């Protein structure tokens, strides 16, 4: 009597082991989950039985299994779309398609559509093809052959040197079975229904695997004594003794064969349960593999071809072939489904990624600021690019978060903002120009709101209360209705009614008339071009406007409050609320008028629905960068978005069982201007809003800039650089370090370690650099290191990177804000002026006092402060260099950004739309016949 190779108990053992494996991983990583999708089309009862069996087994093993049942008439196209979605979903680890499919759907096309890394059936050409190679490493092996090999091993049946005959040549069983036996050193003969003298061939076999799908195809007299018989077949034959009228049998004549064979598998109860068990094993293997890959997250560095002298920025950028952005995304753990591609080298990242990675602890958060800016340029953006490249060279995942530059300066005098030398963001032409159109969306939203303001005043001035109310509440069918956005205004007015017919005449008047006071309108139109002649204009001159003219102006698009909202929004809902509460004017009673009062808040959000998603790009060395938002640094926060930072921090973050300090990656972002402006706003506005806590500060300084702050002669665009800036002068550098020391002091007030990066130029001497280092350390910096990233890329900034790693991993910090928002407005301004600028105090003009009273009366007194002042001095006076003292900051006016969520006092006249110089940068910009842009810098 043959040994019964029973598989039911073995399959149960496999499921128990899988459950234990999953539980073991969950004990250290509670967020680990194993997910299987079973796709079925139609409702065949035999398919339903198999699906229920697989689902039950999956649940027993601790696997999350979803049965996705599509209707019988689903199109092949729609089925392929569904599979594509599961392929791209990083939370799905295995996909199986329950066969057969309806006749109108091509099974080959559908099964091949399953991604190889999720093909847990092991059916696809990639996995089968790799299996056939001698050294092939398929991601998955077909479940039935894998289960048979497991049965043979469990029962101690040695196949090495034996002659195995496999009957059946399907891609599911026969072919992969023959390969597995051959790889186990058996000699294999593959037969099929057309094989001649098949009985004679089978009689030579030590092992027979029958998988031909014909009941009792293999007769007992075909088998030699002591053969091992593996029966894969499961066939239904009539049996009057059974309640169902049929019974299941295999491809081998079991009752007679068991008298000849030494071992045989029963049907059912052996190969079937093990097939399902191996399917589950494949799913768990896939989940473990995905988990391992999700923790790897290390981009491959692109090599640099350094040249001396260093070529132009655009030459360097064009000499590097960027990675395909999808490949870079995959390297850092962004799923394809979480991307919206804009060509090959940039893609928007969907905000849903934050939900998937919500369990991760944040990576290290670093802000780059600088000393007080000079016409030389200190190179914060270049340092940001070089630093993330350097961190990547040290095997740390590093992501840059930077602002999208405005086209105004690009075509004006400043040029682009993609970094420089061998520390750039690429493709630099796309970075500096339209990118993904976010700034154009800001322009459209801002101008729509401006149009809504003037249009509303026009219609209120030309219609009666009744006519205005009637037109605002148009009839749908035979019923008058409020538009959904109107309920926000009704709530603001305290009118708790939903039917327009129920409002009293007074309520109708209050609802319909905004009564905007034209002199209080603070909302300008925008464009992304420097144009001084649009600073002050008159609108409404056409006769069709019936004499309703007013003076207004244009701002640069990045100066719009919409851009500030984009930078400070924490999600789509938050952006909608912020846009709706933007104050554009006051009414004639002194009450604020908002975008939602105008009914345009929702439309603004629609225009910005894509702009809210950060754009993934890369540095020259192929490290990731998230480019998003670009608000002014004087009248706004001067930093990239909260959402970009949050996404980057999760991508660079750690799982619960990883070392949160040693294994975390780095997010390096930049604050505009210096510590007194950009950094102060970054902490007190951006971090206050986001709740994120930075780990370290990098202050960028240069020898030339410190000489200017030490009393060196003034410099300006187009003028020769005085000789003192080209020769060694250690004393002048030390005097200028008073400015650096003040910025270090400012930074230390937030409880964070400070690393000074000395941006190196060829004219700098070792003595000058040593002097800066000494002064920086004396002022409280954790470290001060020179950096040559402009000429050498990431390797040139390794010293700064190592100092930063030490500061984040080994130096204690306790982040704190500078002031409590519940302090009076004047007190908050005074704290900033004294602590950040070194002032003795502040002085409010009568207009500023009037604004202060208005904002307090309107309920905006608990907002943070965003002082607009010159960037060229720690004080309000651009001519005061170094670290001035004994001065009072005059506050000439105050403005409100209610949507963005801050008040910005004006300590200087700030131009919100620059002009163009005599020779703008556009003189140098052109395009070659092959489409290459030339002259962009």
Curated annotation (Swiss-Prot):
Record keywords, A-Z: Amino-acid biosynthesis, ATP-binding, Cytoplasm, Histidine biosynthesis, Hydrolase, Ligase, Methionine biosynthesis, Multifunctional enzyme, NADP, Nucleotide-binding, One-carbon metabolism, Oxidoreductase, Purine biosynthesis
Binding residue positions for NADP(+): 168-170, 193
Binding site for ATP: 374-381
Catalytic activity, reaction form: (6R)-5,10-methylene-5,6,7,8-tetrahydrofolate + NADP(+) = (6R)-5,10-methenyltetrahydrofolate + NADPH; (6R)-5,10-methenyltetrahydrofolate + H2O = (6R)-10-formyltetrahydrofolate + H(+); (6S)-5,6,7,8-tetrahydrofolate + formate + ATP = (6R)-10-formyltetrahydrofolate + ADP + phosphate
Compartment(s): Cytoplasm
Membrane-spanning parts: none
Any one cellular-component term (Gene Ontology): cytosol
One of the GO biological process terms: L-histidine biosynthetic process
Homology family: In the N-terminal section; belongs to the tetrahydrofolate dehydrogenase/cyclohydrolase family.
Pathway assigned to this chain's UniProt record: One-carbon metabolism; tetrahydrofolate interconversion
InterPro entries in UniProt: Aminoacid_DH-like_N_sf (IPR046346), Formate_THF_ligase (IPR000559), Formate_THF_ligase_CS (IPR020628), NAD(P)-bd_dom_sf (IPR036291), P-loop_NTPase (IPR027417), THF_DH/CycHdrlase (IPR000672), THF_DH/CycHdrlase_cat_dom (IPR020630), THF_DH/CycHdrlase_NAD-bd_dom (IPR020631)
GO molecular function, one term: ATP binding
Ranges for region Formyltetrahydrofolate synthetase: 310-937
Stated name of the protein: C-1-tetrahydrofolate synthase, cytoplasmic
Subunit composition and interactions: Homodimer.
Major subcellular location class: cytoplasm
Methylenetetrahydrofolate dehydrogenase and cyclohydrolase, as annotated region: 1-309
Binding site for substrate: 50-54, 97-99, 268-272
Record's comment describing the protein's domains: This trifunctional enzyme consists of two major domains: an N-terminal part containing the methylene-THF dehydrogenase and cyclohydrolase activities and a larger C-terminal part containing formyl-THF synthetase activity.
E.C. number(s) listed in UniProt: 1.5.1.5, 3.5.4.9, 6.3.4.3
């Amino acid at each position: 009597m043959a040994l019964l190779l029973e598989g039911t108990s073995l399959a149960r053992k496999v499921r128990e082991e899988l459950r234990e494996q999953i539980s073991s991983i969950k004990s250290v990583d509670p967020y680990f989950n194993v997910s299987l999708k079973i796709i079925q089309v139609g409702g065949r009862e035999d398919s339903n039985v198999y699906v229920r069996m697989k689902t039950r087994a999956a649940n027993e093993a601790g696997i999350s299994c979803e049965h996705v049942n599509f209707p019988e008439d689903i199109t092949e196209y729609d089925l392929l779309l569904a599979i594509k979605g599961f392929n791209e979903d990083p939370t799905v680890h295995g996909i199986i398609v329950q066969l057969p499919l309806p006749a109108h759907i091509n099974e080959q096309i559908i099964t091949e559509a399953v991604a190889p890394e999720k093909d847990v059936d092991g059916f696809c050409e990639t996995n089968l093809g790799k299996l056939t190679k001698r050294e092939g490493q398929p991601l998955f092996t077909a479940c039935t052959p894998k289960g048979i090999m497991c049965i043979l091993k469990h029962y101690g049946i040695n196949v090495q040197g034996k002659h195995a005959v496999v009957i059946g040549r399907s891609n599911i069983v026969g072919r992969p079975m023959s390969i597995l036996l051959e790889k186990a050193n058996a000699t294999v003969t593959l037969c099929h229904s057309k094989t001649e003298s098949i009985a004679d061939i089978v009689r030579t076999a030590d092992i027979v695997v029958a998988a031909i799908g014909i009941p009792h195809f293999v007769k007992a007299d075909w088998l030699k004594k002591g053969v091992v018989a593996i029966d894969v077949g499961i066939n239904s034959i009539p049996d009057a003794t059974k309640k169902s009228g049929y019974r299941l049998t295999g491809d081998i004549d079991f009752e007679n064969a068991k008298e000849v064979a030494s071992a045989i598998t029963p049907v059912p109860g052996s190969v079937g349960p093990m097939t399902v068990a191996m399917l589950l094993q494949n799913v768990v293997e896939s989940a473990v593999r995905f988990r391992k890959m999700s923790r790897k997250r290390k981009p491959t560095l692109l090599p640099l071809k350094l040249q001396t002298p260093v070529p132009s920025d655009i030459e360097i950028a064009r000499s590097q072939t960027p990675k395909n952005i999808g490949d870079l995304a995959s390297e850092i753990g962004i799923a394809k489904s979480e991307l919206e591609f804009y060509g090959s080298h940039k893609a928007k990242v969907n905000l849903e990624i934050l939900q998937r990675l919500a369990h991760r602890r944040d990576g290290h958060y670093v802000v780059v600021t600088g000393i007080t800016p000079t016409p030389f340029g200190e190179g914060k953006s270049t340092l940001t690019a070089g630093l993330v490249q350097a961190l990547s060279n040290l095997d740390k995942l590093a992501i840059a978060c930077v602002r999208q530059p405005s086209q105004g300066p690009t075509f004006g005098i400043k040029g682009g903002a993609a970094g420089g030398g061998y520390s750039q963001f690429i493709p630099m032409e796309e970075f500096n120009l339209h990118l993904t159109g976010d700034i154009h969306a800001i322009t459209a939203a801002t101008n729509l709101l401006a149009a809504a303001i003037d249009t509303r005043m026009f219609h209120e001035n030309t219609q009666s209360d009744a006519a205005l109310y009637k037109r605002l509440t148009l009839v749908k069918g035979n019923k008058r209705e409020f538009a959904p956005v109107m309920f926000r205004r009704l709530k603001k007015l305290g009118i708790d009614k939903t039917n327009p017919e129920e409002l009293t005449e007074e309520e109708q008047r209050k609802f319909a008339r905004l009564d905007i006071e034209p002199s209080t309108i603070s909302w300008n139109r925008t464009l992304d071009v420097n144009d001084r002649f649009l600073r002050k204009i008159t609108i409404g001159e056409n006769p069709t406007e019936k004499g309703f003219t007013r003076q207004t102006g244009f701002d640069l698009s990045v100066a719009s409050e919409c851009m500030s909202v984009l930078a400070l929004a924490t999600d789509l809902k938050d952006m909608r609320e912020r846009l709706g509460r933007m104050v554009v004017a006051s009414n004639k009673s002194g009450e604020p008028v908002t975008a939602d009062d105008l009914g345009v808040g929702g439309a603004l959000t629609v225009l910005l629905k894509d702009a809210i998603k950060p754009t993934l790009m890369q540095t020259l060395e192929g490290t990731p960068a998230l480019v998003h938002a670009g608000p002014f640094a004087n009248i706004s926060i001067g930093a990239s978005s909260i959402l970009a930072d949050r996404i980057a921090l999760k991508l660079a973050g750690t799982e619960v069982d990883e070392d949160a300090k040693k294994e975390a990656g780095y997010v390096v972002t930049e604050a505009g201007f210096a510590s007194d402006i950009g950094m102060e706003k970054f902490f007190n506005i951006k971090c206050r809003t986001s709740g994120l806590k930075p780990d370290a500060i990098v202050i960028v300084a240069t020898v030339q800039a410190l000489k200017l702050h030490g009393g060196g002669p003034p410099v300006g665009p187009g003028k020769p650089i005085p000789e003192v800036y080209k020769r060694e002068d250690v004393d002048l550098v030390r005097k200028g370090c008073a400015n650096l020391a003040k910025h270090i002091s400012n930074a230390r007030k937030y409880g964070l370690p400070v690393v000074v990066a000395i941006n190196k130029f060829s004219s700098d001497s070792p003595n000058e650099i040593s002097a800066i280092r000494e002064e920086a350390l004396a002022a409280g910096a954790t470290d001060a290191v020179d950096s040559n990233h402009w000429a050498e890329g990431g390797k040139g900034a390794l010293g700064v990177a190592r100092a930063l790693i030490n500061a984040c991993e080994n130096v204690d910090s306790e982040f704190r804000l500078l002031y409590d928002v519940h302090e009076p407005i004047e007190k908050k301004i005074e704290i900033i002026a004294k602590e950040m600028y070194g002032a003795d105090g502040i002085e409010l003009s009568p207009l500023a006092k009037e604004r202060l009273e208005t904002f307090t009366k309107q309920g905006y007194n608990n907002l943070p402060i965003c002082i607009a002042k010159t960037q060229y001095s720690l004080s309000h006076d651009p001519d005061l260099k170094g670290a001035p003292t004994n001065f009072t900051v005059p506050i000439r006016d105050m403005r409100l950004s209610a949507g963005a969520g801050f008040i910005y006092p004006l300590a200087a006249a700030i131009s919100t739309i620059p002009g163009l110089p005599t020779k703008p940068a556009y003189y140098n910009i052109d395009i070659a016949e092959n489409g290459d842009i030339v002259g962009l810098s």
